[in-house]
Structure formats: C-alpha cells, structure tokens
Design a protein with these regions (language model features):
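ABC-type nucleotide-binding domain
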Residues: 1-166
C-alpha cells in the first residue's frame, strides 16, 4: 500500500514517529500521555470489533455514562437504527463474542456508532465503510458531515466515492 493505515496509526500513537512530529491542537502528541490522547480520539478500524454483551453495552464501551438519547443519536448517524429496531430486544439484543451474530455491515455500523457515542474531538475511520453498500455509505457520510461538523474527521477509504465529499 501507500502507507495510509500506517499514517493513521501514528495519530493515536499505536506507533511513534521516528522523524518529524504530529501535532494535535498545536501540541506534539509525544508530549501527551497515550491515555489523554486516546480520550480525544474515536478510532474505527476496517474490521469493526464487537464484544459479547448487548448492542447497548457495545455502544457504551467508549462512554459508559452516555445517555439513552446519545446512544440513539449515535446509532442514527451510523445508520444502525433501522436494523436495531428490527431486533425483538432492540438495544438489549445480545451480541455474540466478535459480533458473529450480525452481518459485516451491521458490525461496522455498530463500531462506528460506538465511536460517535464517545463524542471525541477527532474521528479516525480506517477503511471503516468497506462493508457498507454504496447507498448506506453515502447516507452515513452525509450524516457524519451534518452532525459532526465541529469535529475532525480522518477517513481512509478504498472507494473514491467514500472520500469525494469527505
């Protein structure tokens, strides 16, 4: 590849830069604790990770004290509401370890919703839309632009349509 994911992995300090510097709010990220830095970041990898528990507990993983309204808003932005509402238990639906009982696209939308529920300053989407169909991808990007306009969004994507209006 061209180093897109490597560059993205430098921001939350999964690796430290060997030359130069990366600044967040004008501060070299090496001068900020990893915990403090990662509190500012909502990171969604290409393969969304889910944990055993409920949909609700998965969405609260980054912000345990999120309100019901915040959780529902995050799901709506991530285009997850429609499939959540079809489940008999809705947000209390059990998720198997690794999310084996939901589709790839549903897993990605839940991982995206979890990052949104955290309400960080910076969102990093590392090819996080790849399992979404084109319509869902477009609707999700529009919602991100409308609802998260005060945040920094970094999007790595294979599809040119994903980043055209990012």
């Amino acid at each position: 590849g061209s180093g897109k994911s490597t560059l993205i992995n430098l921001i939350p300090r999964f690796f430290d830069v060997t030359e130069g510097e990366i600044l967040v709010d004008g501060v070299d990220i090496r001068n900020v604790s990893q915990h403090e830095l990662r509190e500012k970041i909502g990171y969604v990898p290409q393969k969304g990770v889910l944990f055993s528990g409920t949909i609700d507990s998965n969405l609260r993983y980054g912000k345990e004290d999120a309100t019901e309204k915040e959780i529902e808003k995050a799901a709506k932005i991530a285009q997850a509401t429609e499939f959540i509402e079809t489940k008999p238990e809705k947000y209390n639906t059990e998720i198997a370890q690794g999310g084996s009982n939901v589709s790839g696209g549903q897993k990605q939308r839940l991982a995206i919703a979890r990052a949104i529920a955290k309400n960080p300053e910076i969102y990093i989407f590392d090819d996080s839309f790849s399992a979404l169909d084109f319509k869902t991808d477009a609707t999700l990007r529009k919602a991100l632009n409308n609802e998260l306009s005060d945040s920094t969004l970094l999007i790595v994507a294979q599809r040119i349509s994903t980043i055209m209006k990012a």
